[in-house]
Amino acid sequence: MLTAQDKQKIIKENQLAESDTGSPEVQVALLTARINDLKGHFEAHKKDNHSRRGLLRLVSQRRKLLDYLHDKDVERYRSLIKKLNIRR
């Protein structure tokens, strides 16, 4: 589970402006952190299919945001993919 300090750190690293908390970059970074956090959960609990459904929903939501960013600005998309080490 991400703590409030972890979220603030992720937001600070990815925000475009001082008060930016809702840009696609910030949202994708937060979703990526949650997805990576759940990966560790599934190593210990392989049969937790209820949480797996939630993971798939998070991955889908991140994919939609990445597709939106790709349509709007390809350079921002590529830099974000490289920064977060997301494969495409």
From Swiss-Prot:
GO terms for biological process: translation. The keyword Cytoplasm does not apply. One of its GO terms (cellular component) is cytosolic small ribosomal subunit. Gene3D superfamilies: 6.10.250.3130, S15/NS1, RNA-binding. The keyword rRNA-binding applies. One of its GO terms (molecular function) is rRNA binding. InterPro entries: Ribosomal_uS15, Ribosomal_uS15_bac-type, uS15_NS1_RNA-bd_sf. It comes from the Bacteria. Keywords: Ribonucleoprotein, Ribosomal protein, RNA-binding, rRNA-binding. HAMAP family: Ribosomal_uS15_B. Belongs to the universal ribosomal protein uS15 family. One of the primary rRNA binding proteins, it binds directly to 16S rRNA where it helps nucleate assembly of the platform of the 30S subunit by binding and bridging several RNA helices of the 16S rRNA. This is Small ribosomal subunit protein uS15. It comes from Francisella tularensis subsp. holarctica (strain LVS).
